[in-house]
Structures are given as structure tokens and as C-alpha cells.
């Protein structure tokens, strides 16, 4: 059966430091965990996008152009892309208050964090975007506008967390993001996801790890698996919350 899981690891920092592709993949993975229709639309969109781009390359290579052939792909790209856009928009709106709630608890600070969903479709509908950028797409030989260019903007007090957030603030934000993901999965599936804490001592001090485990325990998120190279350190942290545990 389906057993949802969420991992918190040092590699989560890439969600802040890397480009938009890593954040898109993360957003897609979060939504797809509980929405099979979204996953289907995403697969169809990516497949059609590849075909449209291949046709644009063919046109340039052979110095030809056929608008009717291109529009065969425009219709499904518009259809699937618009559905994906709407679901991404709704998901970010739904999860944001939970992210803010957990960030306040974890950071014990007064900073206001927010997540802004950036998309070309915020400016115009997909059909118009394809029409307006046709010549540009022909020159570039790929589709320059669409939901495959979307991004999530992580802000703290109106500024980019990537540029203005301290290491501690960035860590707190990422943990809040993952905990919000867990809560969202639980709300939709009525199942407790397994939480995997992978080598978190690498980026968090012992007190912050204890706070995290206590918070998760209070929220009744279910089973927690912790990986660490120092057995004694893990035992010390687990003992603080007085919960049943097993060390392997």
C-alpha cells in the first residue's frame, strides 16, 4: 500500500541555493504525493513540451515552418499546463499558513516568511503566451514561456531568504517547509507520513534537533527515523523526549 514519507536532510539547503528547477521538482513531488491527476497532467505536459521543442529544432534545421503542425502541440500544452498552474497556485496558498506557523515556533523570532509562486501564467493565459512568443521560440528552438519556467520565491520580511537570511533562519525555514508538507499529507490522506531525519546533526546543533523532534512528537506526526554516525548523540536527543525508541 501507499506509505507517504518526508525526509529532512542537509541537501534541503539546495532548495534555497539552487535555481528554480530544484524548487519546481520539490513542488511537483509534494503535490504528486497526494494527487495522481496532477502527476498524470505533469507527465503529459513534459511529453508534449519535448515534442514541441523537437519540432522547433526540426524547423530551424530544415529551414522550414508549418504553423498547423506546431499548433497540434499548442493545444495539449495549454490544456495540461493551465491545470498544473491552477493546482500549484492552490497548493502554495493552502500550505503557506502552515509554513508560517511552524517557522514561528521553530525560530522563536518575529520574522515573517512567505512563499510566492512565480509563473508566466500570472501575467497572461497560456494560449496568448505561446502566440506572443512564437518568433522567439523559433529563434531559440525551444518553448520559452510556460509552467516549466515556474519558480518559488522564498522571502523573509520581504527579502530573499537566499540573500538576507542567516544560516539559522534558512534552516528553520526549510524545516518549517517540510513539516508543513507532512501536515498537508496527513490532512489529505488521513495517514501519518514517516519522517526521515537524515544526518541532520550535520546542519543543526543538538538543541535544535531536540526542538525539532519534540515539535514533531507534539504534533503526533507518527514514526521518526533518524540516521547519524554518532550513536551516543542520537540516544541523548531521543532520551530528552521520553518516547519509545529503538537504536540500530
Please place each PLM-identified region on the residue numbering:
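Secondary-structure edge/capping motif, primarily at the C-terminal ends of alpha-helices
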Residues: 56-63
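Walker B catalytic acidic pair
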Residues: 198-200
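H-loop (His-switch) and adjacent beta-strand-loop-beta switch element
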Residues: 241-248
Amino acid at each position: 500500500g501507499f506509505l507517504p514519507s518526508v525526509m529532512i536532510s542537509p541537501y534541503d539547503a539546495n532548495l534555497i541555493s539552487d535555481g528554480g528547477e530544484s524548487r519546481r521538482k520539490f513542488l511537483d513531488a509534494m503535490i504528486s504525493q497526494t494527487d495522481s491527476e496532477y502527476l498524470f497532467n505533469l507527465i503529459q505536459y513534459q511529453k508534449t513540451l519535448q515534442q514541441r521543442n523537437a519540432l522547433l529544432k526540426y524547423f530551424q534545421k530544415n529551414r522550414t515552418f508549418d504553423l498547423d503542425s506546431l499548433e497540434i502541440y499548442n493545444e495539449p500544452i495549454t490544456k495540461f499546463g493551465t491545470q498544473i498552474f491552477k493546482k500549484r497556485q492552490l497548493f502554495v496558498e493552502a500550505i503557506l499558513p502552515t509554513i508560517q506557523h511552524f517557522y514561528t515556533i521553530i525560530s522563536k523570532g518575529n520574522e515573517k516568511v512567505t512563499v510566492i509562486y512565480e509563473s508566466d501564467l500570472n501575467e497572461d493565459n497560456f494560449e496568448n503566451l505561446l502566440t506572443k512568443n512564437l518568433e522567439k521560440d523559433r529563434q531559440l528552438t525551444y518553448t520559452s514561456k510556460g509552467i516549466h519556467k515556474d519558480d518559488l520565491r522564498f522571502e523573509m520580511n520581504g527579502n530573499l531568504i537566499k540573500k538576507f537570511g542567516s544560516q539559522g533562519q534558512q534552516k528553520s525555514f526549510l524545516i518549517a517547509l517540510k513539516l508543513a508538507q507532512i501536515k498537508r499529507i496527513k490532512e489529505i490522506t488521513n495517514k501519518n507520513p514517516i519522517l526521515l531525519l537524515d544526518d541532520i546533526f550535520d546542519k543543526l546543533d543538538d538543541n535544535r534537533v531536540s526542538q525539532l523532534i519534540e515539535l514533531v512528537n507534539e504534533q503526533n506526526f507518527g514514526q521518526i527515523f533518524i540516521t547519524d554516525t554518532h550513536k551516543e548523540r542520537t540516544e541523548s536527543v531521543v532520551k530528552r523526549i521520553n518516547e519509545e525508541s529503538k537504536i540500530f
